[in-house]
Curated annotation (Swiss-Prot):
It comes from Streptococcus thermophilus (strain CNRZ 1066). GO terms for cellular component: plasma membrane; proton-transporting ATP synthase complex. This is ATP synthase subunit delta. The gene is atpH. It is a peripheral membrane protein. HAMAP family: ATP_synth_delta_bact.
Length: 178
């Protein structure tokens, strides 16, 4: 994404976040953004809206489906996106909106990659420790399995990264031997 588009995405995202806080509709807009992003993930809507050969009218019609079930604030936002012919950046705008909300209330998803599945007790303890060490509120734990780690785990949250995997320790040991 070029700098001009990135600036545009930021401008639209900040505008929606501002409205959410001004109108005390943060939780409503967060939920609506998540629902729309789910539709993006489950369909080819992002590709469709990015196509230059798809008419503005067709894109507007696609966005109108969301307007039927969204708040007045989201409806207005989607209307502005349509009127300004910016449907092609909607996905990026919505992703940034969630990031801005996260930054505002210091709440983040925690991604844990481990060699084998974690027990519920381990997940709970891990969320508590991450919350304290990273000084964040944790929303949920996203668990990934990567058997190549051999043992240990990798944690990612709020642009922070902790790697205690045996694989990384072996790689570090190998580098020290050279």
């Amino acid at each position: 994404m070029d700098k001009k588009t990135q600036a545009l995405v930021g401008q639209y995202a900040r505008s929606l976040v501002e409205v959410a806080f001004e109108q005390d509709a943060v939780s409503t807009i967060q939920e609506e953004v998540r629902q729309i992003l789910t539709v993006f993930a489950e369909t080819n809507l992002k590709t469709f809206l990015s196509q230059v050969n798809v008419t503005s009218e067709a894109k507007k019609e696609s966005l109108s489906f969301f307007q039927e079930s969204c708040s007045v604030y989201m409806n207005n936002f989607l209307e502005v996106i349509s009127l300004n012919d910016r449907a092609n950046i909607l996905y990026d705008v919505l992703k940034l909106v969630l990031e801005l909300f996260d930054q505002e209330d210091n709440t983040y998803d925690v991604t844990v990659t481990s060699a084998s599945p974690l027990s519920e007790e381990q997940k709970t303890r891990l969320l508590t420790i991450v919350s304290q060490k990273f000084e964040i509120k944790t929303r949920r734990l996203v668990e990934k399995i990567d058997e190549e780690l051999i043992g240990g785990f990798v944690i990612k949250a709020k642009n922070k990264f902790v790697d205690t995997s045996i694989r990384s320790q072996l790689q570090a040991f190998k580098m020290n031997l050279k």
